[in-house]
């Protein structure tokens, strides 16, 4: 996958999110800072500031497979930017499995993945990241890995950025062991239980309904959220297409 100009700035973005001065104008960044305030110094903490009467966030579930170029594009170029802009009204769930198949062989699950054994391995790696890391840090680490061409090789540098206390060896041990097998089996069950069944990947379910090819994720999230909209949603609502009549 071609390198994005956005990803190298991820560490800087996080620093900005965590270090915006208290006197800065209200914005999604300021909201994130307020949510991070109770965290210990030096530890990333991206927690949604929740009011007593706040409506629930919009749920976005992504069913995908790690080596699918379309999945990688959606994750890095659409889901991640949307998360950056409206993280406070968004609840993202990643389910790495996709179009894989499983079978029970003598009490152990074996998997066949659309893009070969390496995809099965990386599906397990990402499932283990989701299992072992705080949710937001797992999401950011997976975005980092999916952006880069050699995902397995870049597990270590991505962890160093977003979860420096977690060793790559512990993630690989999880992925190659019984826990990785169990996690991928759970993802298989979640994927197989989809109603309607998924037709392709990436398969995106927003508040329980499949997203159509015509939908734009950020606009859809803004439309579905029932509370006070973030500033970016207000901008979207006031925008319109310009046309030139003949």
From Swiss-Prot:
Disulfide bonds join 68-71. Induction: By LPS in spleen and blood. GO terms for biological process: antigen processing and presentation of exogenous peptide antigen via MHC class I; antigen processing and presentation of exogenous peptide antigen via MHC class II; negative regulation of fibroblast proliferation; protein stabilization. Glycans are attached at residues 91, 104. It is found in: Secreted; Lysosome. Keywords: Disulfide bond, Glycoprotein, Immunity, Lysosome, Oxidoreductase, Redox-active center, Secreted, Signal. Lysosomal thiol reductase that can reduce protein disulfide bonds. May facilitate the complete unfolding of proteins destined for lysosomal degradation. Plays an important role in antigen processing. Facilitates the generation of MHC class II-restricted epitodes from disulfide bond-containing antigen by the endocytic reduction of disulfide bonds. Also facilitates MHC class I-restricted recognition of exogenous antigens containing disulfide bonds by CD8+ T-cells or crosspresentation. This is Gamma-interferon-inducible-lysosomal thiol reductase.
């Amino acid at each position: 996958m071609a390198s994005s100009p956005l990803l190298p700035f991820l560490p800087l973005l996080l620093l900005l999110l965590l270090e915006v001065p208290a006197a800065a104008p209200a914005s999604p960044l300021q909201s994130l800072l307020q949510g991070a305030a109770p965290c210990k110094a030096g530890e990333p903490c991206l927690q949604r500031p929740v009011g007593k009467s706040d409506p629930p966030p919009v749920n976005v579930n992504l069913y995908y497979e790690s080596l699918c170029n379309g999945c990688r594009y959606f994750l890095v170029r659409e889901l991640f930017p949307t998360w950056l802009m409206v993280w406070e009204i968004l609840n993202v769930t990643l389910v790495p499995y996709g179009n894989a198949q499983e079978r029970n062989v003598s009490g152990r699950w074996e998997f066949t993945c659309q893009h070969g054994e390496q995809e099965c391995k990386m599906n397990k790696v990402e499932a283990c990241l989701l299992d072992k890391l705080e949710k937001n840090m797992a999401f950011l680490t997976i975005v980092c890995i999916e952006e880069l061409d050699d995902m397995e090789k870049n597990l270590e540098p991505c962890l160093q950025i977003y979860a420096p206390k977690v060793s790559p060896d512990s993630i690989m041990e999880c992925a190659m062991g019984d826990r990785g097998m169990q996690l991928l089996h759970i993802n298989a069950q979640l994927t197989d239980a989809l109603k309607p069944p998924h037709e392709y990947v990436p398969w995106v379910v927003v508040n329980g309904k499949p997203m159509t090819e015509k939908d734009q994720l950020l606009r859809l999230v803004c439309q579905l959220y029932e509370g006070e909209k973030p500033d970016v949603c207000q901008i979207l609502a006031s925008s319109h297409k310009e046309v030139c009549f003949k």
